[in-house]
Amino acid sequence: MNIGITDPLNALVPMVVEQTPKGERSYDIYSRLLKERIIFLTGPVEDNMANLILAQMLFLESENPDKDIFLYINSPGGSVTAGMAIYDTMNFIKPDVSTICVGQAASMGAFLLTAGAKGKRFCLPNSRVMIHQPLGGFQGQASDFEIHAKEILSIKDKLNRLMAEHTGQPLDVISKDTDRDNFMSADQAVDYGIVDSVFKNRASK
């Protein structure tokens, strides 16, 4: 069973056939890579995807609590609550979670990228990173707008403080830099402290 992605194009996911003592066994490619402790965070961050990633992390912890997990990120961002569920689980489990940006890590994707274990956060050379403040949209009674505005400001402050902790940047710098969309190359993400290094090939690891 493929538990790596939630995209409707799942039908196009290639299968891998392995020879075992009991005969042939087939896996979809994501389930096969899960055996190598590789998890993919692809597409918008939302509740269903977050639940699948949480389940995979907890499963891999039960398999071996002392071996690293590798989280490959290619995401435009998405739900803060779904992202924080992934973030909290990354910190809750015993294995280190190494994060690798392929393509893009924007918004909550960038936040999860920098939340990887120190020294184990990477970008591929042509990937892009984007940080900004959380977006809010609300429809309802006028009396509720103030409540939701306060909640958005509280979330913004929490995310900025955590980003400052993970990057080593001063809080006022993070607050200023996330006020608008802030795009970075892989090398700029290293300089900023979002990742630790750029992988050009496996030999550079």
Swiss-Prot record:
<keyword id="KW-0645">Protease</keyword>
<comment type="function">
    <text>Cleaves peptides in various proteins in a process that requires ATP hydrolysis. Has a chymotrypsin-like activity. Plays a major role in the degradation of misfolded proteins.</text>
</comment>
<dbReference type="InterPro" id="IPR018215">
    <property type="entry name" value="ClpP_Ser_AS"/>
</dbReference>
<comment type="subunit">
    <text>Fourteen ClpP subunits assemble into 2 heptameric rings which stack back to back to give a disk-like structure with a central cavity, resembling the structure of eukaryotic proteasomes.</text>
</comment>
<dbReference type="Pfam" id="PF00574">
    <property type="entry name" value="CLP_protease"/>
</dbReference>
<feature type="active site" description="Nucleophile">
    <location>
        <position position="107"/>
    </location>
</feature>
<keyword id="KW-0378">Hydrolase</keyword>
<protein>
    <recommendedName>
        <fullName>ATP-dependent Clp protease proteolytic subunit</fullName>
        <ecNumber>3.4.21.92</ecNumber>
    </recommendedName>
</protein>
<dbReference type="InterPro" id="IPR029045">
    <property type="entry name" value="ClpP/crotonase-like_dom_sf"/>
</dbReference>
<dbReference type="GO" id="GO:0004176">
    <property type="term" value="F:ATP-dependent peptidase activity"/>
</dbReference>
<comment type="similarity">
    <text>Belongs to the peptidase S14 family.</text>
</comment>
<keyword id="KW-0963">Cytoplasm</keyword>
<dbReference type="GO" id="GO:0006515">
    <property type="term" value="P:protein quality control for misfolded or incompletely synthesized proteins"/>
</dbReference>
<dbReference type="InterPro" id="IPR001907">
    <property type="entry name" value="ClpP"/>
</dbReference>
<dbReference type="InterPro" id="IPR023562">
    <property type="entry name" value="ClpP/TepA"/>
</dbReference>
<dbReference type="GO" id="GO:0005737">
    <property type="term" value="C:cytoplasm"/>
</dbReference>
<dbReference type="GO" id="GO:0009368">
    <property type="term" value="C:endopeptidase Clp complex"/>
</dbReference>
<feature type="active site">
    <location>
        <position position="132"/>
    </location>
</feature>
<dbReference type="GO" id="GO:0004252">
    <property type="term" value="F:serine-type endopeptidase activity"/>
</dbReference>
<dbReference type="GO" id="GO:0051117">
    <property type="term" value="F:ATPase binding"/>
</dbReference>
<keyword id="KW-0720">Serine protease</keyword>
<dbReference type="InterPro" id="IPR033135">
    <property type="entry name" value="ClpP_His_AS"/>
</dbReference>
